[in-house]
A protein has these predicted regions:
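Conserved CoA-thioester-binding segment of acyl-CoA-metabolizing enzymes
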Residues: 1-62, 98, 195
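Terminal peptide-recognition signature
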Residues: 22, 26, 41, 59, ...
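C-terminal long alpha-helix characteristic of the crotonase
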Residues: 27, 130-135, 185-234, 247, ...
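Active-site-proximal glycine-rich helix-loop-beta segment
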Residues: 118-129, 133-134, 151-152, 176-178, ...
Length: 269
């Protein structure tokens, strides 16, 4: 059963078979974001992150462009803001990116078109990114006399510091093949296969223990780039001990030994 939420002006939201789809819906301006879209993205990912019926969230976009970054009309208005107002406004964008990045549910960016500037941040904060072969990518901020500051922690994690040095400074456009080589996206597919590829991946995630998936996401955030210290090792020891003793940990092992489905797959829809 599919449920749809129409409470947003710049987003479309639906949930079907444990998969939530959040679609950027400003195709007339290439899904550029403004303060309204930022607030709505922050709200919807906060809500979906606590929805027990949702096990994976797809971030998609309407039209030919995934996201062109910030709305130029909004940016023009920001030029007249005071320093304090600019700080507050930038913080809203930063908090939205953090909300998606820290969302307890796995997130997948389904990239059907070009990604520019702040749109790169939306891709980078998702756990998995799949793009069509014709998609182009660009960190274009320096062309406008700006810097990709709020998105930088996530983009650098996604493509690596060395690659970021080149593309932050040059504002070069690169294609999906290069994005895949850099590790910025995980897969590049033909346009007609994007929906099926994303659906297949969602189905695989939905079959897994929701608690274990959440634990893995937290684990990845905690250990990525961290030095291997005694404290880190102790945290990993505690992590496996806790998950083994958890309800779903016990159920998963028992179900495997008994050659049956675990209960998270047998709960009525």
């Amino acid at each position: 059963m599919q449920t749809e939420t129409n409470n947003y002006k710049s987003l479309l939201v639906s949930v079907e078979q444990h998969v939530a789809t959040v679609t950027l819906n400003r195709p007339e301006i290439r899904n550029a974001f403004n303060d309204e879209m930022i607030a709505e993205l922050n709200d919807v990912f906060t809500q979906l992150g606590t929805d027990d019926d949702v096990r994976v969230i797809v971030l998609a976009a309407a039209g030919k462009v995934f996201c062109a970054g910030a709305d130029l009309n909004w940016m023009r208005a920001m030029a007249d803001y005071s320093h304090e107002e600019n700080l507050a406004d930038a913080d809203k964008l930063a908090q939205m990116l953090k909300t998606i990045y820290q969302c307890p549910k796995p997130t997948i960016a389904a990239i059907q078109g070009d990604v520019y500037a702040g749109g790169m941040g939306l891709v980078a904060v998702c756990d998995i990114a799949i793009a069509v072969k014709i998609a182009n990518f660009c960190l274009s901020e320096v062309r406008l006399g700006l810097a990709p500051a709020t998105i930088s922690p996530y983009v650098v994690r996604a493509m690596g510091a060395r690659a970021a040095q080149r593309y932050f400074l040059s504002a070069e456009v690169f294609d999906a093949k290069k994005a895949r080589q850099l590790g910025f996206i995980h897969e590049r597919v033909s346009e007609e296969w994007l929906k099926d590829e994303v659906a297949t991946l969602c189905a695989k995630i939905v079959k897994n223990s929701p608690d274990a998936v959440k634990t893995c996401k937290n684990l990845l955030h905690d250990i990525a780039g961290a030095p291997i210290t005694d404290d880190l090792i102790a945290d990993t020891v505690k992590g496996i001990a806790d998950i083994r003793a958890s309800t779903q940990g016990k159920e998963g092992v028992q179900a495997f030994l008994q050659k049956r489905k675990p209960d998270w797959l047998t709960v009525p829809e």
